[in-house]
């Protein structure tokens, strides 16, 4: 699956002001995703395993 990485409060994980390539590494390391990029202003991840939670509009509290 794919989606936005979340912080500890369930909000989208910000990529501002992170260096280029930060989100790719973050998604791979923390979400076990295949890749990721900064979809300003938040990290968006591809190839996230189905058991890993990503940000969901329906349950957004931020």
Swiss-Prot record:
Q: Does the keyword Disulfide bond apply?
A: yes
According to the UniProt record, list the residues that bear Cysteine amide. Answer: 62
| Family that this chain belongs to | Belongs to the long (4 C-C) scorpion toxin superfamily. Sodium channel inhibitor family. Beta subfamily.
Source organism (scientific name): Tityus bahiensis
Q: LCN-type CS-alpha/beta domain: from which residue to which, for each copy?
A: 1-62
* Annotated GO biological process: defense response
Q: What does this protein do?
A: Beta toxins bind voltage-independently at site-4 of sodium channels (Nav) and shift the voltage of activation toward more negative potentials thereby affecting sodium channel activation and promoting spontaneous and repetitive firing. This toxin is active on mammals.
Q: Name one Pfam family in it.
A: Toxin_3
Instruction: Present the record's domain note.
Output: Has the structural arrangement of an alpha-helix connected to antiparallel beta-sheets by disulfide bonds (CS-alpha/beta).
Query: What tissues express this gene product?
Result: Expressed by the venom gland.
The molecular function terms in GO held by this entry are:
sodium channel inhibitor activity; toxin activity
UniProt keyword terms in alphabetical order: Amidation, Disulfide bond, Ion channel impairing toxin, Neurotoxin, Secreted, Toxin, Voltage-gated sodium channel impairing toxin
What is the phylogenetic placement of the source species in the record?
Eukaryota, Metazoa, Ecdysozoa, Arthropoda, Chelicerata
Q: Which cysteine pairs are joined by S-S bonds?
A: 11-62, 15-38, 23-43, 27-45
Q: Where's it found, cell-wise?
A: Secreted
Name any GO cellular component annotation. Answer: extracellular region
**Keyword Transport included in the entry's annotation:** no
Q: What is this protein called in UniProt?
A: Toxin Tb2
């Amino acid at each position: 699956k794919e989606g936005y990485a979340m912080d500890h409060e369930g909000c989208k994980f910000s990529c501002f002001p992170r260096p280029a390539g930060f989100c790719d590494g973050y998604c791979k390391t923390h979400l076990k995703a295949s890749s990721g990029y900064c979809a300003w202003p938040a990290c968006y991840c591809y190839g996230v395993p189905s058991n890993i939670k990503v940000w969901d509009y329906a349950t957004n509290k931020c």
